[in-house]
Amino acid sequence: MRVVILGSGVVGVTSAWYLAKEGHDVTVIDRQDGPAQETSAGNAGQISPGYAAPWAAPGVPLKAIKWMFQRHAPLAIRLDGSSLQLRWMWQMLRNCDTSHYMVNKSRMVRLAEYSRDCLKDLRAATGIQYEGRQGGTLQLFRTEQQFDNAAKDIAVLDDAGVPYSLLTAEQLATVEPALAKVAHKLTGGLRLPNDETGDCKLFTERLAKMAEQAGVKFIFNRSVDKLLVEGDQIAGVLCGDDIIKADAYVVAFGAYSTALLAGLVSIPVYPLKGYSLTIPITDPASAPFSTVLDETYKIAITRFDDRIRVGGMAEIVGFNTQLAPARRETLEMVVRDLYPHGGDISQAVFWSGLRPMTPDGTPIVGRTPLKNLYLNTGHGTLGWTMACGSGQLLADIIQGRRPAIVADDLSVARYRAGFQPLNIAPLHDIHPIR
């Protein structure tokens, strides 16, 4: 079967890989001159199923108000009055209660845990290298309240069967030696030993080459103008003067998926702007061993081979990708505070990207009302974490095979009034069926 995939970020490329492995004739189209040139290019580098959780959480509305007056706030909102922004924010607010949070988190952890297994299998099968580490992640607390509140996260981890360890400030250096010098600034941490790290851009570029060798065709520097519809299916993709036809079509367009699908399929995907710094390492012993997440500022600091990636924050500002100096100051402040001698900040590369976020935090993977149109989008800040699982899941669905995890509540159908999952996965049973 001929399959066209729109988008060559990590989600689009993993989709292409798994579909090609099923024997399909796959073509990937992207407006950029190569894979992973937008959102996948500069993310924080964490593969963190244990921290998979929606931004829509109890207490976030009040925190958002407080953050409006803080210089280094993790979330910023700039209202533009657009119906897309206002509708998305309203939908997000409706998901900020405990019951919605638990349902959404269970979906996200289910897919993220499965995705990590898929990545491990892919790595074993191909030997792909992407400066990956399997050193776990460490969430850092700066206040006693944060340390005490970890009990709530631990309860969720227990239900999900995710291994963890709660560390005192003095114990942090046992997993991140460079933190010994700043332990007095911290109250403790939550470590998830099974989480991983890696350069998402490098992974995507190398997997794209492997996919090309497996027969996938990549068409770069080509804008996608419109999806053409005949009856109840897609008839082709309009790219300038050309119409590209296939038997099935996959939209992996990230934050731009909503506009492309307008009038065809309604999806609540909105751009959540994030930032990162990439810093050359000058003293390996003073740099992170793996990755940490500063709970106060929601900023991750990750070790690659000879670089430190510092990423995080969220801005609800539409499709604005301009670099904000104040955000760079925040990133620099956090890395200087925790790893002051690890790298040369004066040589850092500053980046911003638009994460495709749904109001419930869960990506949209699966079928649509148009019988040959499929979606793989809306992964928010967890595209790297969920990419392999989403790609394999989509390949199973297109292949007509039962997926390895419960998947009906990951599709766009969940936004339909009266939707009820065919299979309810309780929080304590969200691991892959293997």
From Swiss-Prot:
Protein's recorded name: D-amino acid dehydrogenase
Record-linked Gene3D superfamilies: D-Amino Acid Oxidase, subunit A, domain 2, FAD/NAD(P)-binding domain
EC number: 1.4.99.-
Keywords: FAD, Flavoprotein, Oxidoreductase
Binding site for FAD: 3-17
GO molecular-function terms, A-Z: D-amino-acid dehydrogenase activity
Pfam families recorded: DAO (PF01266)
Annotated pathway: Amino-acid degradation; D-alanine degradation; NH(3) and pyruvate from D-alanine: step 1/1
PANTHER family with a match to the protein in the record: D-AMINO ACID DEHYDROGENASE, SARCOSINE DEHYDROGENASE-RELATED
Principal EC category: oxidoreductase
Catalytic activity, as annotated: a D-alpha-amino acid + A + H2O = a 2-oxocarboxylate + AH2 + NH4(+)
Cofactors, names only: FAD
Cellular component annotations (GO), alphabetically ordered: cytoplasm; plasma membrane
Stated role: Oxidative deamination of D-amino acids.
The keyword Oxidoreductase belongs to this UniProt entry's keyword annotation: yes
Taxonomic source organism: Yersinia pseudotuberculosis serotype O:1b (strain IP 31758)
Family in the record: Belongs to the DadA oxidoreductase family.
GO biological process terms on file: D-alanine catabolic process
